[in-house]
Amino acid sequence: MSDVTIVIPNYNGIAFLKTCLDSVLAQTGVQMDVIIIDNGSVDGSQEFISSNYPQCELVCLDQNYGFCRAVNEGINRAKSPYVILLNNDTEVRPLFAASLVASMKEDKSRFSCSARMLMYTKRDLLDDAGDFYCAFGWGIARGKGRPKQEYETADQIFSACGGAAIYQTEMVRLIGGFDEAHFAYLEDMDLCWRARIHGWKSWYEPDAEVFHVGSATSGSRYNRFKVLHSAGNNLYMIYKNMPLAQMLLNLPFLLVGFLIKYLFFVKKGLGKDYREGLARGFELCRKNKDRKVRFLWKNLPAYVAIQVELWKNILLFLPGRREN
């Protein structure tokens, strides 16, 4: 049995596939399987993979079902104890996979471990060193745009970034996998939040380096698609993972946070899209009540720890503050 399965979702990403797959297949120090889930690409991706990378398992879906459906397909096919999710617009270092596997083996309570993601064109700058979330309802990619030397230490994070992270295969299955109602955006944070409720940890491993282009599938950093899905998924994620008492406790913070976000997107010309996204979020909550995490008293210590972190992480947005 392989040590790890690398799952790569792809949608019309033929321009990135050679760089990504060549670097993946050059991994050392680990036995691995590679599964590529193609979301109905029409740019020749499927033919390119079949012709040039027969050692990879290619699964072709009939249309674009989004990130969550794609990676769930890969996770369900994985036969290894660990699964790595990797964006197609990446290039990984030779010890990327081995470093992630070693980190997970160090501590069996680790549900996930995020790689050190570096900008593809500015390779000394960070793209993501794990994700955080605060009581304002804001997520933050830790270290984005900072020199990579500032994040040399492995430590605990709120959530692994699903663009380059490793997970315990059986634990992902146990807590229900990625929620396909998300389609794309914040699905990785939702998954790690659920794991946190059950007492599991997410970690950051700087030795696992990956270079990331970013926004290769969806386009620019701020666009209608991203704003619409991110706003709705954020509201849905809060509803799913917070018991009623916790939602009420955070309501003043969330109202302020959502208002600030709305004003920000109004200035970007995307205010209408943000409102539509929130409306979509309420609809997701209504349609998926059965997916709300059931409160159990045994998980109360985890809820308390999460809440303290949500408050603490507000400080990360103050001027001059840097994430630890």
Model regions and ranges:
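A short, conserved alpha-helix in the catalytic core of glycosyltransferases
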Residues: 158-209
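A conserved acidic beta->alpha catalytic loop
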Residues: 23, 38-47, 63
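Glycine-rich, basic loop-to-helix element that forms the pyrophosphate-binding segment
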Residues: 61-78, 88, 99
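Non-catalytic, C-terminal membrane-associated alpha-helical segments of glycosyltransferases
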Residues: 247-324
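Short, acidic, metal-binding catalytic loop of nucleotide-sugar glycosyltransferases
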Residues: 22-31
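Conserved donor NDP-sugar-binding/catalytic core segment of glycosyltransferases
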Residues: 90-133
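Short aromatic/hydrophobic "clamp" motif used to bind/position activated sugar donors
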Residues: 83
